[in-house]
């Protein structure tokens, strides 16, 4: 029996390093630092990829794109997300919606909200109304509060598409 509806949850964290922008949801956002990572460090797309993989128990982003593999050095996370979503589609499932939260003190993300949502929708070929991106702070608590990095979480609902 095919389970008709599946939920997945993912998260990702990256520390700040020298740089002049962060890439979130495929969008380059000016900032006083970059994100330390093997790929482009896009915590939004990494969390979303993990949520999609988790929904169908397909492992995690580290298993599919190990940071020890040189072919993923500096990889564009939009390409990785597209590959992950194709795994979902190949199994007969499709995204109902994604709900993503980004936690950081800086940069402020409100003015990039629609652009980030549209970027994700474009990669997945879904309507922008299926994608939610919210930004919050941790009230100066923890590593994000000390402006040492960024955290993102994602929850997805996927459903089996009868043929």
Swiss-Prot record:
Binds 1 divalent metal cation per subunit. 4-CDP-2-C-methyl-D-erythritol 2-phosphate binds at residues 12-14, 38-39, 60-62, 65-69, 136-139, 143, 146. Its cofactor is a divalent metal cation. Its EC number is 4.6.1.12. InterPro entries: MECDP_synthase (IPR003526), MECDP_synthase_CS (IPR020555), MECDP_synthase_sf (IPR036571). GO terms for biological process: isopentenyl diphosphate biosynthetic process, methylerythritol 4-phosphate pathway; terpenoid biosynthetic process. One of its GO terms (molecular function) is metal ion binding. A divalent metal cation binds at residues 12, 14, 46. PROSITE patterns: ISPF (PS01350). Pfam families: YgbB. Pathway: Isoprenoid biosynthesis; isopentenyl diphosphate biosynthesis via DXP pathway; isopentenyl diphosphate from 1-deoxy-D-xylulose 5-phosphate: step 4/6. It catalyses: 4-CDP-2-C-methyl-D-erythritol 2-phosphate = 2-C-methyl-D-erythritol 2,4-cyclic diphosphate + CMP. Keywords: Isoprene biosynthesis, Lyase, Metal-binding. It comes from the Bacteria. The record marks 38, 137 as: Transition state stabilizer. Involved in the biosynthesis of isopentenyl diphosphate (IPP) and dimethylallyl diphosphate (DMAPP), two major building blocks of isoprenoid compounds. Catalyzes the conversion of 4-diphosphocytidyl-2-C-methyl-D-erythritol 2-phosphate (CDP-ME2P) to 2-C-methyl-D-erythritol 2,4-cyclodiphosphate (ME-CPP) with a corresponding release of cytidine 5-monophosphate (CMP). Belongs to the IspF family. HAMAP family: IspF. Homotrimer. This is 2-C-methyl-D-erythritol 2,4-cyclodiphosphate synthase. It comes from Acinetobacter baylyi (strain ATCC 33305 / BD413 / ADP1).
């Amino acid at each position: 029996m095919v389970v008709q509806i599946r939920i997945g949850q993912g998260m990702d964290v990256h520390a700040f390093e020298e740089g002049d922008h962060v890439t979130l949801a495929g969008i380059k956002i000016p900032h006083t630092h970059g994100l330390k990572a093997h790929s482009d460090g896009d915590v939004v797309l990494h969390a979303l990829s993990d949520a999609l993989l988790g929904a169908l128990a397909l492992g995690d982003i580290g298993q599919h794109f190990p940071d020890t593999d040189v072919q993923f050095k500096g990889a564009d996370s939009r390409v990785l997300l597209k590959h992950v979503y194709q795994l979902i589609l190949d199994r007969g499932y499709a995204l109902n919606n994604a709900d993503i939260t980004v936690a950081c003190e800086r940069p402020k993300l409100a003015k990039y909200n629609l652009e980030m949502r549209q970027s994700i929708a474009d990669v997945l070929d879904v309507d922008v109304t299926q994608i939610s991106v919210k930004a919050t702070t941790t009230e100066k608590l923890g590593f994000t509060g000390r402006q040492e990095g960024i955290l993102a979480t994602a929850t997805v609902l996927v459903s089996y598409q009868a043929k």
